[in-house]
Amino acid sequence: MRITATVRTKNEEKNLRRFVESYQWADNVLIMDDFSDDETYLNEVVSEFENAQWKQFPGKRVAKEGITRAPHGNHINALFDWAEEIGTDWIIFDDCDCFPNKLFRSSAREIIEACKQDFIYLVRIYLYKDKGYFPYMSKPAGDWEASAYAFRANQGFRFSVDESLPYIQTFVRPDESYVLRLMPPYCLIHCPWPDDEAIAIKRDRYSRTYGERYSRFDPLNFAGELDNLEVWMD
């Protein structure tokens, strides 16, 4: 069985090596870049890890408010097309600032190979700088909430190309039996807010791309209270 991890990049110098290193149990790590300012880090990472390769997004890019980028849906779908073209049984898709915790990595291959469902969901743990994590982001209704992480290839799973709904998943799952939901201590570690600079960059990009409501973007305003990390959150 072949397992392929996929990720989009644009100026991800701080995150890419950690992402690829966390998927050394996968057969391939496919990186599709959106014209980073400097390609050096991409070449350095793929030269270090034999299962990694990268290429530029091949489609048409869009410009809005001074930001030129690959459309979300087209970029993601191009990654999925690439994975299926080279041949794979399972596709993992995640952000470059997210990675599976050590406990999941130690058994990930066996879990995926034994999975009878078409989708695997995992819980994301949202870290804030080095100060802890936001429990609310992982369990907004009180219980752990898992989201899409991996899916069986060649089933037609693709993202919407409607830019107003960039993350709508167009593959219809007939019922919950098609999903394997994994709960902590298996998890994904998400690091979207490592420092003030990263928060400011996100605030600027999101407000220009999605509107004024993001101009005051700060996780301390919407992500709930911070809590200390558990031992399995690494």
Regions found by a protein language model. Name each.
Residues 66-81, 99-234:
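Catalytic-site signature of metal-activated, phosphate-bearing donor transferases
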